[in-house]
A protein has these predicted regions:
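Core catalytic lobe of class I
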Residues: 1-172
């Protein structure tokens, strides 16, 4: 992430919400779904779970946001793969942020993967940079599980696993 590009995009303004859905660092492009009952044990190659660029990638976009885009008391939301929680939390801590809680998107259907169980949820860290707690956005306290439908296959934009708009609308 280029800080100069972020600066140009923000044009001197600062956002009170830092809501992101960065790459999950798994080798999935929407075309490599597993086939039912196929033995995939030999197909977990070197790259399917390669996170070697992960911390650098996450640190880069976080640093650009802090330097050029968000207010001191911005609320942070970051969707991520469960597999990357420790790495993401370490990146947040390096930037002075902490994970206040986790939001779970409960999908209306499971996603066929090579895992032992169908993924029917996605986690999202919610937090901020200490000591700058952001104000609550809702008058009432919302649950930490958000039940939202997934996009139908023919409704998806140019991304294999898009988030529903409410995943970003609720924090707004």
């Amino acid at each position: 992430t280029s800080a100069a590009d972020v600066r140009r995009l923000m044009n001197g303004e600062r956002a009170v919400l830092f809501a992101t859905d960065p790459p999950y660092l798994v080798d999935y492009d929407g075309s490599n779904h597993p086939t039912r009952n196929k033995d995939w044990s030999q197909s977990y190659g070197v790259t399917w779970d390669d996170s070697s660029q992960g911390a650098e990638l996450y640190d880069g976009f976080i640093a650009a946001a802090v330097a050029e885009a968000i207010t001191e008391d911005a609320a942070w939301y970051c969707w991520h793969a469960s597999r990357r929680q420790a790495m993401l939390e370490a990146c947040w801590e390096k930037a002075g942020a902490f994970v206040h809680q986790q939001i779970i998107w409960v999908k209306d259907r499971g996603v066929l993967t090579r895992s032992h169980y169908l993924w029917k949820h996605e986690p999202c860290f919610m937090g901020w940079r200490r000591p700058n707690r952001p104000p609550k956005v809702a008058e009432q306290t919302l649950p930490s599980t958000w039940e939202m439908p997934s996009f139908a296959k023919d409704e998806r934009p140019d991304h294999p696993t898009p988030k529903p708009l409410d995943a970003f609308g609720i924090p707004m």
